[in-house]
């Protein structure tokens, strides 16, 4: 999910939380104290694309760096909860604007996931506000930290971070990364079309460029109508896009946040969901349960249709992620 959409849902842009690795273990630490990881050789080497085609539906999660006002240890609380659902990998977002400073926190959290939780991590790498030199430096750091997978994104434009000119589009970033290191490279896709694309045909044509540049796996923007995703898959396959495509799912937990997100990110609300919001929107507990049930229903239908994978936008809420994961655990393995 883009930082714009995340901001619409949490009301703040994720900020940098770690400076470098200089503490031995997790626990309560004063703000600003730094973290050190044991970056010994891992027992596995895993590219995200290798997870697919093995007889089960891939199930992954997204997290974001905690807000500046949150305690440093809050990321551990999220990850402690997510490890129990055994995701196939966890992606880590960036902050609005995609500045190199915010991408640095993405790198550090991805390293925590890889080296402390032993779960494959996929770091978001953006280029809208970065030079080739800055991207190269970030990639070198990721490789040094044992992070082998990246999600290559243009990133959201932000007036606080004037755009650089080294990369015009995400396909250029994909090609650049593939030439510079043995990374698994994934890309984003939009079942209802990128907000800046003039039409769906052009959008799929641009997505094909991204895959031809070297993207080995795609993660979709969130959507609420599975038929939109199925039509998108058909367009992709007809265009010759054969890489695995994960369906991005976000549970509806807050009426105001979802309405802001829809206005900013372009996802549409089907009639079934608008009825749900109208009925339960003023009752937070009821909406939470109804929203989780809606997400479970979406995921069950997608798995039954044989989708490659499910990417759950957790919004750093491991309890909701676990409730959803537990509900679909058996059908994922069939």
Task: Give the ranges of each region predicted by the language model.
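Glycine-biased, low-complexity coil/linker segments
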Residues: 11, 25-26
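N-terminal amphipathic alpha-helix/helix-capping segment at the start of soluble metabolic enzymes
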Residues: 38-61, 68, 274, 333-334
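Glycine-rich, positively charged N-terminal anion/phosphate-binding segment
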Residues: 43-49, 72-81, 85, 98-119
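Active-site mouth loops of central-metabolism enzymes
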Residues: 58-74, 121-133, 186-202, 279-293
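Conserved, mostly hydrophobic/aromatic
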Residues: 62, 90, 142, 210, ...
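Active-site beta-loop-alpha junctions enriched in small/polar residues
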Residues: 63-66, 93-97, 124-130, 155-157, ...
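Glycine-rich, proline-tolerant flexible connector loops at the mouths of alpha/beta enzymes
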Residues: 66, 87-107, 155-165, 216-229, ...
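Active-site pocket-lining/capping segments in soluble small-molecule metabolic enzymes
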Residues: 165-190, 238-292, 297, 328-334
């Amino acid at each position: 999910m883009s930082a714009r959409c995340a901001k619409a849902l949490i009301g703040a842009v994720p900020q940098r939380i770690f400076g470098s690795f200089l503490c031995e273990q997790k626990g309560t630490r004063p703000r600003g104290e730094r973290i050190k990881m044991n970056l010994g050789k891992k027992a596995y080497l895993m590219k995200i694309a290798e997870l697919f085609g093995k007889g089960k539906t891939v199930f992954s999660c997204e997290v974001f760096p905690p807000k500046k006002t949150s305690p440093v240890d809050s990321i551990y609380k999220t990850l402690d909860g997510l490890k129990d659902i055994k995701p196939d990998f966890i992606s880590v977002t960036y902050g609005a604007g995609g500045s190199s400073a915010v991408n640095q926190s993405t790198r550090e959290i991805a390293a925590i996931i890889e080296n402390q939780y032993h779960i494959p991590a996929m770091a978001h790498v953006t280029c809208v506000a970065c030079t080739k030199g800055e991207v190269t430096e970030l990639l070198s750091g990721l490789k040094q930290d044992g992070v082998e997978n990246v999600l290559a994104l243009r990133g959201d434009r932000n007036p606080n971070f004037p755009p650089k000119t080294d990369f015009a589009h995400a396909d250029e970033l994909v090609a650049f990364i593939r030439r510079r290191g043995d990374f698994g490279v994934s890309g984003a896709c939009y079942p209802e079309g990128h907000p800046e694309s003039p039409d769906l045909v052009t959008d799929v044509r641009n997505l094909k460029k991204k895959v031809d540049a070297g993207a080995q796996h795609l993660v979709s923007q969130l959507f609420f109508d599975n038929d939109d995703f199925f039509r998108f898959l058909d367009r992709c396959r007809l265009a010759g896009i054969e890489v695995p495509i994960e369906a991005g799912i976000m549970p509806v937990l807050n009426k105001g946040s979802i309405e802001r997100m829809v206005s900013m990110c372009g996802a549409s609300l089907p009639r079934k969901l608008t009825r749900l919001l109208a009925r339960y929107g003023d009752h937070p507990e009821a909406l939470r349960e109804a929203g989780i049930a809606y997400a479970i229903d979406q995921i069950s239908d997608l798995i039954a249709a044989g989708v490659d994978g499910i990417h759950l936008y957790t919004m750093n809420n491991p309890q909701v992620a676990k409730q959803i994961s537990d509900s679909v655990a058996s059908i994922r393995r069939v």
